[in-house]
């Protein structure tokens, strides 16, 4: 039986996906989520200003500077832990 991913792992993956801008469909497929599950995460990331919504022909979500800093910190912690 495969264990569920942690909330932090999902958020980290979503921040990574949104670095170059991503629509909701791309986030859903690349993060292996469904549309019902992804909405609360998008709302949380928008509320915390870790991503921003950019309106154009399609609505794109892009990781903010604050989100990139958080992602870098998460990746640093993961690399430190993997060396133990």
Region locations from a protein language model:
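Basic, amphipathic "hinge/linker" alpha-helix immediately C-terminal to the N-terminal HTH DNA-binding motif
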Residues: 57-74
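A short, conserved structural fragment
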Residues: 46-55
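Short capping segments at the starts of secondary-structure elements
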Residues: 18-23
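A short acidic, leucine-rich amphipathic alpha-helix
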Residues: 26-30
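Short alpha-helical segments that sit at the start of domains
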Residues: 1-12
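Amphipathic alpha-helical dimerization/coiled-coil segments
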Residues: 76-84
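Short amphipathic alpha-helical interaction segments
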Residues: 33-47
